[in-house]
Amino acid sequence: MSQRRVQIVILCEDKQQEVFAIHFLQKRGFTLDRNFRTEICPKGAGEQFVREKYAQEVVEYRRQRNKRSGMLIVLIDADKKTVEERLKQLDDALIENAQELRQPHEKIAIFVPKRNIETWIYYLQGTNVDEQAEKPYPKFDKNESICKPYVEQLVNQCYQGNLDENAPPSLKAACGELQRILPLIG
């Protein structure tokens, strides 16, 4: 895989999402050095932080896009909402800030794990998961890097288009989002 130097911003809820996204990008061949920035919720409601910061990051992405190659990666848990409801909330945040909705040609990728990112990790570890479960899957506090070998497996499956048919629907949607954005970043 070739090395790609792109200004990348990751907007996410927590450390687990950050580790997941960084490792995924690295395995896809992106160089994450000084052209990389993470916006992560310091404390409190992570999804609220992402929703509130999203419009600001889109404005910055659009302001910079003619100067350099950039990409905005957004991770936000669906929690008890549907993926579509969470995406609509992000659209609404743009509208409230007098911004156009995300356009197909923009290098803005949104990944919405249903319940939480841990649902995806448990699935990748071989656990049967239920995105409709009443309680979210337990976090890997202070062991966020446990996801790395499973992220590598996911990178290969998404890239080759052979994600298992019983994969969680939100993970299938994420692979679709990845396939949408990859041609844009060359």
Regions found by a protein language model. Name each.
Residues 10:
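Conserved SAM-binding loop
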Residues 13:
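Phosphate-binding/switch region of NTP-binding enzymes
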